Regions:
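Short aromatic/hydrophobic "clamp" motif used to bind/position activated sugar donors
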Residues: 36
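Hydrophobic helical membrane-anchoring modules
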Residues: 129-195
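Acidic donor-binding segment of Leloir-type glycosyltransferases
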Residues: 1-15
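A recurrent flexible, glycine/aromatic-enriched loop bordering the glycosyltransferase active site
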Residues: 63-71, 83-100
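The conserved acidic donor/metal-binding loop of glycosyltransferases
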Residues: 40-46
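Conserved donor NDP-sugar-binding/catalytic core segment of glycosyltransferases
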Residues: 47-75
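A short, conserved alpha-helix in the catalytic core of glycosyltransferases
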Residues: 104-109, 114-134, 139
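Glycine-rich, basic loop-to-helix element that forms the pyrophosphate-binding segment
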Residues: 14-31
Length: 195
């Protein structure tokens, strides 16, 4: 569908090792453009997104994302989306998509291919540590499927916990251990509620 919508694009299909960080890094290595754009499969950028990105780069913004709206009328998700207009580090996430010049991507080391979780946040934190981070004032839409399946407040509490664990010095291994325990507990609760 994407190829039909953008026939002028030169698309490459590439297989990489398991893990989102490894896969996105592999894509960056075969890309031949000056700007990299990472987009989750269930996120939909605004019309003319490429023009907004090129304009932002020309104005001296080597890395940024779009504002985000969930495809849901849940009041909490509306609030979360509203806060993505701010350039605060805590308001960032992979669902907002990520553009970065290839030069800056290489300079900060790109996606960490060794970590099994938190790859988007890891890259975003290094971008913030490097300098300013720009939010394009246009709206991207993203699926609320995971929130609907797991529960809005339960999933948001999980994200907040991981964020604060990392901010307080937790290692990726500690965060991953928490993630595995949380997933196991969530699956058990889901199974018991269905019985």
């Amino acid at each position: 569908a994407f190829a039909k919508a953008y026939p002028s694009l030169s698309l490459k299909f590439h297989t990489a090792s398991k893990g989102r960080g490894s896969q996105m890094h592999a894509g960056s290595q075969i890309a031949n453009g000056e700007i990299l754009y990472f987009l989750h499969a269930d996120s939909f950028p605004p019309q003319d997104y490429d023009k907004y990105i090129i304009q932002a780069v020309s104005q001296g913004n080597p890395a940024c994302c779009f504002r985000m709206r969930f495809m849901s009328w849940n009041w909490w998700l509306i609030i979360i989306g509203w806060f993505t207009r701010f350039s605060w580090r805590a308001s960032r996430g992979g669902d907002q998509s990520q553009y970065i010049t290839k030069e800056l991507y290489e300079k900060i080391g790109g996606y960490n291919t060794e970590i099994p979780i938190y790859e988007d946040y890891d890259l975003i934190h290094r971008l913030y540590d490097h300098g300013t981070y720009y939010v394009i004032p246009k709206w991207l839409k993203t699926s609320a499927r995971r929130y609907e399946e797991i529960g809005v407040y339960k999933l948001q509490w999980f994200y907040i916990t991981i964020y604060w664990k990392k901010r307080n010095g937790a290692t990726i291994d500690e965060i991953y251990e928490y993630y595995l325990k949380w997933c196991q507990t969530s699956q058990l609760q889901k199974s018991s509620s269905q019985n």
